[in-house]
Design a protein with these regions (language model features):
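Conserved beta-strand -> loop -> alpha-helix junction used to position metal-binding or nucleic-acid-contacting
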Residues: 67-71, 77-121, 219
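Helix-loop elements that line ligand-binding/catalytic pockets
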Residues: 117-185
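Charge-dense polyanion-binding interfaces
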Residues: 111-125, 237-250
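Amphipathic alpha-helical/coiled-coil segments positioned at domain termini
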Residues: 85, 192-194, 199-250
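RNase H-like nuclease fold core
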Residues: 1-75, 82
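Amphipathic alpha-helical
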Residues: 162, 166-216
């Protein structure tokens, strides 16, 4: 079966791993172009495999969108020192959600008086800048009054979400740097950890607003890949999996 040829634009490429379980490798890597067209499926996510692809297109690639996987970042910078990496917004925001989750779990495991942090986990996990009903606002206020640690962590997460609504790149960068400082100085271990993560990825996070690109479209592509694998009864040979994905997604 011949895969149809399409014109590809390599100026921006997006890297995204998925669980393919092919040829004894748990993960494979999908690569998409500027227009979200599938470029290639790599047999694994090893640095040597990614390096081979990047070096083949080093003169064309200017920006790389990716999740917050240090191995990917190190490989991209070593092959493409002049390219800009753009962190995926979804994965960045998830870091803040993990922070409040870990604070919540630590507290309700430490004392029975914090059991409501377990009961109302959905309310706590909700986007803090979304609409809350009067009863939800009242409950959230009670939850914050239970613990200064939780209240401070929740407020910092709220500020984090608010920063991503800023469109001006300079202001975004300024507010992000301030937030990182607040997180590191909070005295809350989960917040400090988040601050360190954001600091390590600060340039790539700033590039989210600078270039206004993200890997959001990849979720739909991954869902299609999952369907392909399910309908093919968990195809195990990589070459067959690759051709099938290229036919269905390209």
């Amino acid at each position: 079966i011949e895969v149809p040829h399409k014109e590809l634009d390599y100026e921006t490429v997006y890297l995204d791993e998925f669980k393919g379980n092919a040829d004894k490798e748990k993960y494979q890597l999908a690569i998409y172009d500027t227009n979200h067209i599938l470029i290639d499926i790599l047999k694994d996510r090893k640095s040597s495999t990614i390096r081979e692809f990047l070096l083949c297109h080093k003169d064309s690639i200017k920006k790389v969108g990716m999740d917050m996987f240090m191995q990917f970042r190190n490989t991209v910078y070593s092959c493409l020192p002049h390219a800009d990496i753009v962190a995926d917004k979804y994965h960045v925001i998830r870091q803040a959600n993990w922070m409040i989750r870990d604070v919540r779990i630590r507290l309700f495991n430490s004392d029975i008086k914090y059991r409501e942090y377990k009961k109302y986990w959905k309310l706590i996990a909700k986007n803090p800048n979304s609409a809350f009903s009067p009863s939800q606002k009242k409950r959230l206020k009670k939850l914050k009054n239970l613990s200064e640690i939780f209240s401070r962590a929740y407020d910092l997460r709220t500020k984090f979400f608010s920063i991503f609504e800023i469109k001006d790149v300079t202001i975004f960068s300024y507010e992000l740097k301030n937030l990182i400082g607040e997180l590191k100085e909070s005295g809350i271990k989960e917040c400090i950890k988040l601050g360190e993560t954001l600091s390590n990825w600060e340039e790539e996070i700033n590039n989210i607003q600078k270039y206004n690109i993200n890997n959001g479209f990849v979720e739909g592509k991954n869902n299609k890949i999952k369907v392909i694998k399910r309908l093919s009864y968990g195809i195990k040979k990589f070459d067959n999996l690759k051709k099938l994905i290229q036919l269905r997604i390209s």
